[in-house]
Each structure stands twice: as C-alpha cells, then as structure tokens.
C-alpha cells in the first residue's frame, strides 16, 4: 500500500501517515506520532507535506488536527497535475532533430 501511495508522489513517511489518518480519522500530530512510531518532528514535517500535496487537510483549532483527503480526491489531484505536466512538456519540448552523419571526401595523391 505504501509503495502505491509513493507512486503518487508521497514520501514513505507521508504515505504511512496518510494511511494512519485515513483509517483513524482526524488526529493531532502528537497522536499520529504515537500511532505510527514516527518522531514528532518528522510527523509535523510530513503532515505539512501532505497538506501541501492536497493529501490531507489541516483543521485549525486549539490543537490542530489533520484529516486524510478522500482517496478519489487524492488520485484526481495527482492525475490532474500529471496531465498538466504532460501538456506542458508536449507543447514546450522541441523535437530532437536527427543528426545525419556526414561524409568525408579525401583527395590526394597515391
């Protein structure tokens, strides 16, 4: 499961935390660290990455909680980004011209 999420651009820690949030619902960073065994500093860094990538939501409160985005939304967001990148590359990368090998004529005395 983690490897499949990594194909969508998540790090191993982000994927682990995404699964934790998805299975348990909204959690604080402390609770995520406790449930996953990942250090709190790494958890908060990974949670920020998940929010930035659209894989989780930050629920602002006295104690901030995080909620995993629905799988469908995660997949749609990543597919949309890939399609945008594909369109950009197709429109902006010039085709490579095939180089023809030249020939040399040697003239001289035998």
Model-derived features with residue positions:
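Short, cationic-aromatic polyanion-contact patches
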Residues: 3-14, 28, 57-81
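A short acidic, leucine-rich amphipathic alpha-helix
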Residues: 31-36
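Residues in the helix-turn-helix
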Residues: 42
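Alpha-helical DNA-recognition elements
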Residues: 45-53
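Amphipathic alpha-helical dimerization/coiled-coil segments
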Residues: 73-110
């Amino acid at each position: 499961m983690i490897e499949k999420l990594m194909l969508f651009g998540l790090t191993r820690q982000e994927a682990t935390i995404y699964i934790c949030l998805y299975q348990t619902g909204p959690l604080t960073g402390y609770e995520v660290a406790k449930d996953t065994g990942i250090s709190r500093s790494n958890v908060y860094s990974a949670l920020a990455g998940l929010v930035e990538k659209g894989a989780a939501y930050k629920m602002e409160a006295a104690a901030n909680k995080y909620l995993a985005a629905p799988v469908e939304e995660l997949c749609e967001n990543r597919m949309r980004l890939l399609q945008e990148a594909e369109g950009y590359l197709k429109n902006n990368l010039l085709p490579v011209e095939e180089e023809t090998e030249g020939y040399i004529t040697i003239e001289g005395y035998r």
